[in-house]
Regions:
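Flexible, membrane-associating and regulatory peripheral segments of lipid-active enzymes
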Residues: 1-198
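A Trp-anchored, charged/polar loop motif used as the substrate-binding/catalytic surface
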Residues: 324-342, 432-442
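Short aromatic-enriched loop/helix-cap "lid" or pocket-rim segments at secondary-structure transitions
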Residues: 199-200, 288-294, 362-367
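Serine-dependent carboxylesterase/thioesterase catalytic core
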Residues: 2-10, 20-31, 189, 216, ...
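C-terminal catalytic-base region of ester-bond hydrolases, centering on the histidine
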Residues: 32, 99-106, 130-137, 345-443
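Active-site catalytic motif of lipid deacylating hydrolases and related acyltransferases
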Residues: 177-249
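Extracellular/periplasmic catalytic domains that process cell-envelope and extracellular macromolecules
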Residues: 179-180, 270-273, 343-347
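Solvent-exposed loop/turn segments at secondary-structure junctions
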Residues: 192-193, 223-224, 257-259, 284-286, ...
């Protein structure tokens, strides 16, 4: 909304708020009735359609409308406060008129404000659980409620601006089909997750790639099992894709342990003829030394107990034969050294890797914040909360992602696990660029 549009809207809202005070200046009853009717219709229009926007997503339209309504209520409240201070101390306006006008104004402002807050509360994808709970529980605390209000406003504004940038980028490049690669994309998840329909491991990334022309498949392998077992499942997935589509090959995008699983499928299970490229993201190619130390210090009975509980849960969630301990052991530096000894890179497969790092323990929530500290304490250096950056390098090194600011990018952020926009890092743009470069290489 432009400055002129906002100013015009605020002007007519102020006329409505002070209609009781302005009525004596309108001796003609018909003029008063028409003015009241017109301003009330305008007020209702503001509630229903608070902003005109070119945004194509209905949720974002509602969200941005909420931002504009809250902003309008704040600005007009401040103006109204200044007007009342002037009327009380500098004029002889009857108290009865001031009180009546004030009550009507307060009701109208409250309704405008609440409409805006409800829109933001229900439609923002970036607010998060804790901010919503904080508002519900602590809205009445002076000072803190203003802090929450400012946070709500900032989050909603940035979310809308970010989404509009994505929309404009797509409209500019949609004819180019930036991600329409020669071979389809096979996305391979990491450990302790599955490819669920109702919760995509890769967040908003697949939809963005598809918008730019990509063809996406998912590996659908076990959430936790040995590298060998997961690789067998990935092999079966690749062969099925090739058979069903006739594509000949696939481009693998693998995160975390999925990178090890994919490498094994290509190097040891004969999939080099069916894979054009492998891109690993935050994969522990040389293992996680802290996993080995932790397993050596924890009671085997306790590890088995946790494993049984995990396997029971994930069997219910879709795994056919999960193996908690085997999956975990293959992340140790000892096992990765063994695997690297047998996983010889296939000459016909383009291999590249990239990673990310957290700025501090505050960059992510549990358990990544704890993992970050453990890795640092044990001498692992810079890491993403699970994997040291030195362990992420394999093949053509694309480097470590380092956005501006102190937050950094965690093991979950790099796959958009929390769907949070990170200042200085466009996760969807990162993958779009990654796939586009594969397209340019002829893959």
């Amino acid at each position: 909304m432009t400055y002129i549009e906002r100013t015009t809207r605020y002007f007519f809202l102020m006329l409505l708020y002070n209609l009781v005070l302005l009525s004596p200046m309108m001796p003609d009853k018909l003029i008063r009735v028409l003015s009241c009717t017109g301003l009330m219709l305008f007020y209702l229009y503001c509630h229903i359609k608070p902003v005109n926007t070119s945004c194509k997503e209905q949720r974002l339209k509602i969200l941005h409308g909420g931002y504009e309504l809250v902003l309008a209520s704040i600005v007009t409240f401040l103006i109204e406060t200044a007007i009342y201070l002037f009327l009380i101390f500098k004029t002889t306006t009857p108290a009865r008129l001031l009180i009546m006008n004030g009550i009507i104004c307060a009701i109208l402002l409250y309704l405008l404000f609440m409409n805006g807050i409800i829109r933001i509360f229900t439609c923002s994808g970036q607010l998060g659980f804790f901010k919503r709970i904080a508002l519900l529980l602590f809205w009445w605390i002076p000072g803190f409620n203003l802090f929450l209000l400012h946070s709500f406003m900032e989050v909603s504004r940035k979310e809308y601006d970010f989404s509009m940038e994505k929309q404009q980028f797509y409209e500019k490049w949609k004819e180019e089909e930036l991600c329409k690669t020669k071979y389809p994309i096979l996305m391979v998840h990491g450990i302790f997750f599955r490819d669920w329909k109702n919760f995509n491991y890769w967040g908003r990334i697949p939809d963005e790639l598809i918008r730019h022309g990509a063809t996406i498949f998912y590996s659908n392998h076990q959430s936790s099992a040995s590298v060998e077992q997961c690789a067998e499942e990935i092999k079966a997935c690749i062969l099925k894709i090739v058979k069903d589509t006739g594509c000949g090959k696939v481009n693998i995008i693998a995160h975390s342990k999925g990178g090890l699983d994919s490498r094994y499928a290509v190097s040891c299970l004969g999939m080099d003829g069916y894979v054009a490229s492998i891109t690993t993201i935050n994969t522990p190619h040389y293992g996680c030394n802290y996993v080995c130390r932790i397993l050596d210090r924890i009671s085997p009975e306790f590890v088995k107990f946790i494993g049984k509980k995990y396997e029971s849960l994930f069997t219910l969630l879709g795994d056919e034969n999960p193996d908690f301990l085997s999956g975990l052991r293959d992340l140790t530096d000892r096992e990765c050294a063994r695997l690297n000894g047998v996983m010889t890179d296939a000459p016909g497969v383009y291999c590249q890797s990239t990673g990310s790092q957290m700025g501090s323990a505050k960059s992510a929530m549990f358990p990544l914040n704890l993992g970050y500290l453990i890795i640092r304490i044990l001498g692992g250096g810079k890491n993403d909360g699970l994997v040291s950056t030195s362990s992420m390098v394999w093949g053509n090194d694309l480097g470590v992602l380092k956005p501006k600011g102190k937050q950094g990018i965690s093991h979950g952020d790099v796959i958009d696990l929390t769907r949070k926009n990170i200042e200085g890092f466009d996760v969807m743009g990162f993958y779009t660029d990654l796939i586009h470069k594969l397209k340019e290489r002829g893959y």
